[in-house]
Amino acid sequence: MPKVTKEKKSRIHNDVQKQGIVFNKDFGQHILKNPLVITTMLEKAALRATDVVLEIGPGTGNMTVRMLERAKKVIACEIDTRLAAELQKRVQATPLQPKLQVLIGDFLKAELPFFDLCIANVPYQISSPLIFKLLLHRPLFRCAVLMFQREFAERLVAKPGDKLYCRLSINTQLLARVDMLMKVGKNNFRPPPKVESSVVRLEPKNPPPPVNFTEWDGLTRIAFLRKNKTLAATFKVTSVLEMLEKNYKLYRSLRNEPIEDDFKMQDKVISILEEQDMAAKRARSMDIDDFMRLLLAFNSAGIHFN
């Protein structure tokens, strides 16, 4: 039976190639061909018959068809009009056709409809903005099961002190619970990518954390510019101080509050870091609670990062 499935997948892929459709690596078009990987991804998403599923980059529809068989509806977002047409043709005149909605265009620019789950073999070049578009979407979805480049996936789950721990790690973990599900080798794709892949499960925190994400992202962006430097050294950088001073003066102006006569942004920032016992800390070893406390201290003093 597995041989029949494999032959069917190969035939569909070959039919696409015979029609002159060349897979575009600029769009990250590496088609997932292993049905066992697809089955595992669907199982880990706990897909229900009542679910609306969002898929980004459906390609030739190997995973799309499997989801259509189980879900109430699949919304497939595809930037390549050729593949979008092939996907629609694949389910044409079948019971699956009414359950498929194809959105043609750039996912990052699209206005997302309601969905319960997101399951996708993600175009790797849009991985980071894709994650935050999903996690900042409202209403919250239940979970996402996504295929990423392996190193990117490892960054998502990295903890303070890990070599790969970075701004991506802490920003994602602020908004969601992140779990590594499995590794997927290059030979599971056609054409095979140059890198290894991994599947990750994201479950948005509900309720969301009580923090302005724009402010949070501004703080972590500065802190992780040089994650091995102390915060005291990082916040002495001229461009950082100029940005914070501009924001501070605007904030005071909007509140009709005068600027202190002896005001110096560097002194104010260092004073806050020392009060929080964080002047000697480095971003590489700081967790979510550390950054929450630091952001609250800065904001309470009128220092903003947006």
From Swiss-Prot:
GO biological process: ribosomal small subunit biogenesis; rRNA methylation
CDD domains per the UniProt record, alphabetical: AdoMet_MTases (cd02440)
Keyword annotations of the record: Methyltransferase, Nucleus, RNA-binding, rRNA processing, S-adenosyl-L-methionine, Transferase
EC number: 2.1.1.183
NCBIfam families for this protein: ksgA
Role noted for this protein: Specifically dimethylates two adjacent adenosines in the loop of a conserved hairpin near the 3'-end of 18S rRNA in the 40S particle. Involved in the pre-rRNA processing steps leading to small-subunit rRNA production independently of its RNA-modifying catalytic activity. Part of the small subunit (SSU) processome, first precursor of the small eukaryotic ribosomal subunit.
UniProt family annotation: Belongs to the class I-like SAM-binding methyltransferase superfamily. rRNA adenine N(6)-methyltransferase family.
Organism: Drosophila melanogaster (Fruit fly)
Name this polypeptide is given: Probable dimethyladenosine transferase
One Pfam family cited in the UniProt record for this chain: RrnaAD
